[in-house]
Amino acid sequence: MKLTDLLYGKYRNLLLATAMFNLGFTIWFSFAPYTGEIASEFGLSVADLGIVASAAIVAVPLGRIVIGPLTDKYGAPVTAGATLVTVGIFSIISAFATTYAVFTGSRIIASLAGITFVIGIQHVAEWFEEENLGTAEGIFAGVGNAGAGLGAYFTLPRIFGDGYVDPIFGSAFLATSVNWRAAFFYTGVLAIILGVVYYVFGDPAKSEAKREATKAGVSWDQWKFIVTRYGAVVLSVAYIMTFGLELAMNGWLGTYYREAFGQGDIVIAATFAATFSIAAGLLRPLGGYISDYVYKKEINLLPWFEGEYRNQWTFATLVYVMLTMFGMTAAGLTGNIYIAVVAAFLVGLGCAFSEGAIFAQVPAMFPDNSGSVAGIVGGVGTVGGVVYPIAFSHALLPNLHVGYTIVGASMIPIVVLTAWVFQPKISEVANDKGWLVDDDLMAGVKGAPGDD
């Protein structure tokens, strides 16, 4: 591929989607490196910061579920442009906030940057053929996810760190308020600019026929049937304990390293936190690749679920993630921040592998309806990012290390449900059988053409 190819067709749209997702994640977690300054500004406790971390995610689950069909109907350039401009405006508003209520409210709206994942997934799928779709989605998701680590945790504190002088905020606010306000303001401006660029230069699909098929391929009855199948439900709750955990850790680790280990240097604490984000983001495509590999080579990784090769890999990654939560508590109790950083990196590794594995299974289980399932999995999975920070920071905990064990214990029912669905006799009907919606009544809907 030549450099000029990036200016045309599918590569231009992949580049736009990836840039959108990366900036979206940077904005989504831009508050995390500055929790110390924000806490001082508004007089917040550690428990209050946990609530702020949850508030930054609370609008995303419903937003992801809603934006999926809207993107199918109106096209990614329209929904991406509208989302980025809205996010940018409220990020700028949060930069000028002088009360806790205004700050929290504006960050909730700015958190809609997290729905850019669903927009990008749909847009990339509209342009790439099936044989290249896994690689394209892997690039999009991996580089985009890294926005939380490389963008929010690594880059922003180095640009807008201690001692930063800004021509706008330096005169309007105290010097201690400059860095985080400037970070929110300038990332908001970038979002507005990218939103306009996306709308002008993005194309919704590779052909008009593809565009019309996507618009016509979704109905309310079809959506209800698909999202209540065993496979869709188990992948959704599994995404809570993987991607939801990633969101929670991205928003919490900076505070954890500072409060639990007395690491007050914003750049060092953010760098430690970034190791998790980089592992969880950049290594994600490897999880999908391994799922493809064990499937093609018919490798039985576990003595259970014989012949269910993708299921075995996904289940192994989920068990690993659960165990690493207990490992985080053990590492923290040593009192050694470097051991805790390594433990968090291992958690990030598990998140990367499991997320890649889960989204390798979405089209495998639902080849005709992967877009609809991706929307519900992505939306439900975000719930973990709302709930887990509260468990990490609850005021009744004896210390900040025990919260990880509580979260790990909460994952056990999800792992048990996954084991049940992944049994060969259940797995083979996981896209036909389900809960709530009558199987026989809706059986005809399953075969209707979907997004892909």
Which sequence ranges carry the predicted segments?
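Residue-level signature of mid-helix packing/kink "hotspots" within the transmembrane helices
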Residues: 29, 56-65, 115, 149, ...
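Extracytoplasmic gate region of multi-pass secondary transporters
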Residues: 31-35, 228-288, 355, 359
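Helix-breaking motifs and short loop linkers at transmembrane-helix boundaries and internal kinks
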Residues: 43, 75, 96-101, 113, ...
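Conserved MFS/SLC helix-loop-helix module at the cytosolic interface between two early adjacent transmembrane helices
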Residues: 62-101
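C-terminal ends and interior cores of transmembrane alpha-helices
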Residues: 85-98, 319-334
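Cytoplasmic helix-loop-helix junction between adjacent transmembrane helices
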Residues: 106-144
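Helix-loop-helix hairpin linking two adjacent transmembrane segments in secondary transporters
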Residues: 140-204, 401
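Flexible cytoplasmic inter-helical loops of multi-pass small-molecule transporters
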Residues: 169, 199-221, 427-440
